[in-house]
């Protein structure tokens, strides 16, 4: 599968975790064990096809240790879990002034649709468990980072 699909700017920040949890005032807490905490940003130009490319990249990215070699196993290889948090602030532009601009981030309606699609398709792709934060709400995210190891991803 080619990762050059469309003209979107979807961004993700992946963090390897031993466990992670998200809670909010509007939903039950969600938690995972060993796997990835995924902060997902959606641009106005993003599509379901671009989200699918990001999913493919995430589940096959070899960032987990195995056997005697570093970085030779993927999320699928380790039967890992994923916690996905919507994060429009990944599109912060701080190049001017003292207040960030988020003009490249998708409108909430579009971002929520792509976020839901991403989570549903990620779940179908096979990680052990996929949990999600509540879109559009203030959340408390707790993570026990492993490494620490964080990887920014962009699908152009």
PLM feature segments, named:
Residues 2-97, 101, 112-156:
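N-terminal, polar/charged subdomain of small-to-medium soluble alpha/beta proteins
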């Amino acid at each position: 599968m080619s990762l050059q699909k469309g003209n979107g700017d979807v961004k993700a920040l992946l963090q390897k975790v031993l466990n992670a949890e998200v809670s909010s005032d509007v939903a039950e807490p969600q938690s995972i064990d060993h796997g990835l905490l995924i902060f997902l940003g959606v641009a106005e130009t993003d599509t379901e096809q671009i989200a699918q490319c990001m999913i493919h990249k995430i589940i096959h990215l070899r960032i987990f240790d195995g056997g005697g070699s570093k970085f030779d196993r993927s999320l699928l290889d380790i039967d890992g879990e994923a916690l996905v948090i919507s994060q429009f602030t990944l599109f912060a532009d701080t190049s001017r002034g003292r207040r960030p601009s988020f003009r490249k981030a998708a409108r909430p309606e579009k971002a929520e649709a792509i976020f839901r699609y991403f989570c549903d398709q990620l779940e179908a792709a096979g990680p052990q468990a996929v949990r999600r934060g509540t879109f559009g709400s203030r959340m408390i995210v707790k993570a026990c980072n492993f490494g620490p190891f964080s990887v920014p991803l962009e699908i152009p």
